């Protein structure tokens, strides 16, 4: 279906139009983005440099850091430019590209979290068979499958949304080209597209949640059968970081995306999207390092090396 007007650009209305808040928000988001950059790239380098971290668990964690950095970078620099220069215009094609990479990488993270849950299940429930269950090739296949699912899902989303007609307005009530905000601008009958996209999003989320739920069900059953307090503590600490990341990630995703557009409050979605697109990528390296002795020890090794240089 062709657009009934030649829409060549969208205008992102941003988080706020209050002039006094533009510079403080620019400073805040620059700080958040720098922490995201340092935290995620630092985690990747740490895993790469320390041979003790060359295991499936940390292979998935390095991919998670890459994805967090990627989808934050798809959004945050444009938001910062809007605060600093008032540059809120985004071309039609740039909007499609931004949405594609954001949806793709967020979906990749979705499947990586499921892969990490399976890895934790194998480590806690079948420790004697862990090295044969989670081989390097199995880890690589799970990671590759996550990327394939992510980019296929994004392709369907972009195809479904940008085949619609845009003739009402080009004012996007958001700070980036998010799916609900752009779809709301369409003057086409978007019921079918919306149902398909909600179905796909629901499938991606609930399939992964089912995998995570089953993995943790077996993990908790195994923990309850353990007789030593040390075993309990080790198993719980192994899973605590991942469980925290899963809870935060899916709580926000379900809140934003699994509602019909008629029930969306754009202002509420904006606040949730800040958390989802910027805060979570910043927090993940912290969550995975605070209670992880192996990461802490690797970091201490790096610091000791720097002292001797």
UniProtKB/Swiss-Prot annotation:
Name of the protein: Olfactory receptor 5B2
Membrane topology (Extracellular): 1-23, 78-98, 157-193, 258-270
Keyword annotations: Cell membrane, Disulfide bond, G-protein coupled receptor, Glycoprotein, Membrane, Olfaction, Receptor, Sensory transduction, Transducer, Transmembrane, Transmembrane helix
Membrane topology recorded in Swiss-Prot or TrEMBL: Multi-pass membrane protein
GO terms for MF: G protein-coupled receptor activity; odorant binding; olfactory receptor activity
PANTHER family recorded: OLFACTORY RECEPTOR (PTHR48018)
Pfam family, one: 7tm_4
Family in the record: Belongs to the G-protein coupled receptor 1 family.
CDD domains for the chain: 7tmA_OR5B-like
Task of the protein: Odorant receptor.
Annotated compartments: Cell membrane
Organism name: Homo sapiens (Human)
Side Cytoplasmic, residues: 48-55, 119-137, 218-234, 291-309
Cellular component annotations (GO), alphabetically ordered: plasma membrane
Gene that produces this protein: OR5B2
